[in-house]
């Protein structure tokens, strides 16, 4: 039977990110993606101006009506949350549909490049820390892993490879989830992802591409979720997600695409088959 995953995050009309990224990725992997939009944006927040509709009041209806319809899920995946209120509504949804058999993957979006996003304050980060602690799998970038663990970003940035590796291993060891992927930092001409799987630690590398584009974390998390829900080992799911993103990043660089538009992943969905 086809696996079914609920994805709780926003959807943007422009910018290949969030639900606009998760829907095609999970679908091509043979997983039914059931979108639960937390907000609707005209364009993702990296643009100079945007308008949005907060869907937080609707999340309670998703929860109650899906329960009424007898919905069961094989996985729940969460991404960008705009407020503590959205986190609380997502928590209620998860409480309603979480079982011992299904997978909860949390992408704890809070910042990047050593800086917390301006829209988030200490209260939100504390709430996200508690929210992510309940997950089976989390996919923070290095900045977010530092926020979750209270680690100074300087303990990682600019340090020697051995120091970075030990910092990553230590952060994974103090975080509650059994499986953790710390995503997408650069080391020389390589891009790296660190994976923690029930205390087993490994770093996977692929060639780096110049530039930075929005939505790559969303694409990675969706591909990872699809593999794990289908019962794949963490290593295989991480490697497939990296193999999928690499040519899309190369195309974005070759075409000179602006970072706010995301990467042209559509032609590379076949890498997920």
Q: What residue ranges belong to the model's regions?
A:
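Conserved N-terminal subdomain of the carbohydrate kinase-like
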Residues: 2-106, 110-118, 267-271
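Short pre-catalytic strand/loop immediately N-terminal to key active-site residues, enriched for Gly-Thr
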Residues: 13, 201-214
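A non-catalytic, amphipathic alpha-helix used as a structural packing/dimerization or gating element
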Residues: 58-61, 130, 170, 236-244
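Conserved phosphate/ATP/ADP-binding segment of small-molecule kinases
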Residues: 118-201, 235
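Short, small-residue alpha-helix embedded
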Residues: 147, 211-234, 238
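Charged C-terminal helix
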Residues: 235-273
């Amino acid at each position: 039977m086809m696996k079914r995953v609920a994805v709780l995050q926003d959807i943007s009309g422009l910018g290949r990110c969030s639900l606009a990224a998760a829907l095609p990725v999970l679908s091509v992997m043979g997983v039914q993606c059931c979108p639960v939009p937390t907000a609707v944006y005209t364009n993702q927040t990296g643009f100079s101006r945007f308008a949005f509709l907060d869907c937080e009041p609707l999340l309670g209806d998703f929860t109650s009506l899906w329960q009424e319809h007898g919905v069961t899920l094989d996985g729940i995946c969460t991404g960008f949350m705009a407020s503590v209120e959205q986190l609380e509504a997502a928590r209620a949804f998860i409480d309603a549909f979480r079982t011992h058999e299904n997978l909860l993957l949390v992408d704890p979006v809070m910042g990047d490049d050593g800086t917390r996003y301006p829209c988030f304050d200490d209260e939100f980060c504390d709430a996200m820390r508690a929210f992510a602690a309940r997950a089976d799998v989390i996919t923070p970038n290095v900045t977010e892993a530092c926020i979750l663990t209270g680690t100074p970003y300087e303990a990682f940035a600019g340090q020697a490879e051995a120091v970075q590796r030990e910092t990553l291993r230590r952060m994974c060891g103090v975080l509650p989830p059994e499986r953790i992927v710390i995503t997408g930092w650069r080391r020389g001409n390589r891009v790296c992802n660190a994976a923690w799987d029930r205390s087993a630690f490994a770093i996977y590398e692929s060639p780096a591409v110049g530039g930075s584009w929005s939505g790559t974390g969303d694409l990675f998390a969706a591909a990872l979720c699809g593999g794990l829900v289908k019962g794949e080992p963490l290593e295989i799911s991480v490697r497939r997600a990296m193999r999928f993103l690499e040519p899309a990043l190369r195309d974005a660089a070759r075409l000179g695409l602006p970072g706010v538009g995301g990467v042209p992943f559509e032609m590379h969905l076949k890498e997920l088959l």
